[in-house]
């Protein structure tokens, strides 16, 4: 699990950024005219007016990846479990102006507690934790493409892998993005989230699980989607990705 505290100052005309490292760090992609990396907690200052009119947005992000259905606490293997995760997330985000809970895939498969019910147990726990969005890892396709869609519904989470298309070019999942607006002192901070999955994962699952799907170039899609969200007025763009290539 990774937790990130981000403070956004909205109301002036130049961008500044200050870095503060946490013990646990995460990497997110933010778009403010450019795309840059966010490491740990970083106050970001977006300016478009006078300083006296600035509004600070306290946004807290909880991020997980590669859970592999390890939902039960296991101190020996340093697994905190979903129960503790939920409590930590609730405590961490309390009092924030806004929060997001995100996952980068390989979530629904990997332990008997999940495989015996085709991922439903994990999906229900994700719903209880309050996840907002996730992207897919190769193991999430293990129960088949339609079951993966069903699990997203059970979890009440948006599955974002917009570079995965049907044969007719339409997106396989119901939506390509999550947009969250946070309003404070008459100003609104708009956060856009999208997801990409490595095309190589099509070759890392049983062919029937992804039959008829086109896994398009992840980098090209990410560039287009970041530009789209920026054009739609997003102050912040977060990319969720699951890749098999460490150089991607």
Which sequence ranges carry the predicted segments?
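Generic detection of intrinsically disordered/low-complexity segments and helix-coil linkers/edges
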Residues: 2, 30-33, 102, 135
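Bacterial Sec-dependent N-terminal signal peptides
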Residues: 2-29
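Low-complexity, acidic Ser/Thr/Pro-rich repeat tracts that form intrinsically disordered stalk/linker regions
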Residues: 4-13, 43-59
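Compositionally biased, intrinsically disordered low-complexity segments
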Residues: 6-12, 30, 37-39, 74-76, ...
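Sec-dependent N-terminal signal peptides of Gram-positive bacterial secreted proteins and lipoproteins
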Residues: 21-44
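Acidic, metal/ion-coordinating pockets
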Residues: 47-248
